[in-house]
Regions:
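Sec-dependent N-terminal signal peptides
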Residues: 4-15
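Negatively charged
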Residues: 17-285
Length: 285
């Protein structure tokens, strides 16, 4: 009987501890701030009521918006987090310049927004204000399930070295792909289903390394291609078959895209209202 009572007491204690360590939307950001106030780099805040950050139970958290935004030195290993219920990762690592930990095991199947997830820029009237410092993250995230994501605006633009294979991403629900890629990205994304994308504003803005075949992209719903290949210095791929019938803005599209010299004479541009500076500085065209 005594052993039975002791066993019940032990189970109660364990249950209480486990419950205390489980974070919710109401407690998550407070826990992050408290932990990083004492251990801003590795999150090994042993005095936290939730334990050290790598071991946190975040399985009930749905909103991780701006979780580590502007935590410039943050670089904790959070690879084992259960993020299966998270819906927003918007600005999650915004200007977390030093973060470079593996996240490939994350279950992102319920995420709907990854806007500025690894971004560094502020925007003024939808024009980026570039920042002198870029982010370190360059990990494999190719097996992420992004099938429910609708916005990837500015998602990877702040990454100075990111050049990972994300060819298998299902982007069929994405509508906003503006300002998406960074300087080093040059991977095959030819099979992406972009048929629902309406905004390609600056998608390869300053993506100086990118030179992949995207001729088969379904661009029939795109409204803006403004600044799309702005200073994409390496890009020179055929775009002849693109459906541009709904595009209204092509201003600055190939601005200083110094390598581009492809035939786009067959494009339907009857709905375009702005072509200002479309080929300015495109010296090969």
């Amino acid at each position: 009987m005594k052993k039975f009572i002791l066993s019940l007491s032990f189970l109660f204690i364990i249950s209480t501890i486990s419950h205390a360590q489980q974070l919710t939307d109401a407690t998550f950001q407070h826990a992050v701030n408290a932990c990083l106030s004492t251990n801003p780099v590795d999150g090994l805040c042993t005095n936290s009521q939730y334990g050290i950050m790598p071991d946190w139970d975040v399985s009930q958290v749905t909103d991780m918006t701006s979780a580590f935004s502007r935590d410039e030195s943050f670089n904790a290993d959070i690879s084992n987090w259960d993020v299966s219920n998270v819906r927003s990762m918007e600005r999650m690592f915004f200007r977390a310049f030093d973060f470079n930990q593996p996240l490939n095991s994350w279950n992102t199947s319920n995420v709907v927004t990854m806007e500025s997830m690894f971004g560094v820029r502020y925007f003024s009237s939808n024009v980026p204000i570039d920042y002198y410092r870029e982010m370190s993250f360059n990990q494999n995230i190719g097996n992420w399930d992004v099938s429910n994501v609708f916005t990837m605006k500015d998602m990877l633009s702040g990454l100075k070295a990111f050049n990972q294979d994300i060819s298998d991403w299902d982007v069929s629900n994405v509508t906003n792909m503006s300002w998406m890629f960074g300087k080093s990205f040059n991977q095959d994304i030819s099979d992406w289903n972009v048929s629902n994308v309406t905004n390609m504003l600056g998608v390869f803005y300053d993506a100086i390394s990118f030179n992949q075949d995207i001729s088969n992209w379904d661009t029939s719903n795109v409204l803006s291609m403004k600044l799309m290949f702005w200073r994409a210095n390496s890009f020179n791929q055929p775009l002849t078959d693109w459906d541009t019938s709904n595009v209204t803005d092509m201003s600055g599209m190939f601005y200083e895209a110094i390598s581009f010299n492809e035939d786009i004479s067959g494009w339907e541009t009857s709905n375009v209202t702005d072509m200002g500076g479309m080929f300015e500085g495109a010296i090969s065209f």
